[in-house]
Amino acid sequence: MNLIEKIEQEEIARLSANKTLPSFAPGDTVVVGVNVVEGARKRTQAFEGVVIAKRNRGLNSSFIVRKISSGEGVERTFQTYSPLIASIEVKRRGDVRRAKLYYLRDRSGKSARIKEKLPARKVAATPAA
């Protein structure tokens, strides 16, 4: 591991020490709590939508969340290790076969729905008679 990678790993450990990042993937519906400063007031703003892309690049990792607001599509890119992100909560797991869901930009209504990923069923081993 070279020096830059080592420094990036230390920075990731420092930034993620006080908060836990859940594992999520494209297709999942997430609620991202964003710290917003308005004048002297600081508050947390929730942004809920579908993760359409995830970019894993160490300290430069990011993800794009898309939602429909007042009939208009809104996308927001978040840096995974940004101090502006207060929390990430996974509301629903999506079952998709693509890493990037940019095709959802062209779709609306029922065609833009994503199937829910159901937890795997445990098969009980029955002894043969």
Curated annotation (Swiss-Prot):
The keyword Ribonucleoprotein applies. Gene3D superfamilies: 2.30.30.790. GO terms for cellular component: cytosolic large ribosomal subunit. It comes from the Bacteria. One of its GO terms (biological process) is translation. The keyword Ribonucleoprotein applies. Keywords: Ribonucleoprotein, Ribosomal protein. One of its GO terms (molecular function) is structural constituent of ribosome. PROSITE patterns: RIBOSOMAL_L19 (PS01015). Belongs to the bacterial ribosomal protein bL19 family. NCBIfam families: rplS_bact. This is Large ribosomal subunit protein bL19. It comes from Polynucleobacter asymbioticus (strain DSM 18221 / CIP 109841 / QLW-P1DMWA-1) (Polynucleobacter necessarius subsp. asymbioticus). The gene is rplS.
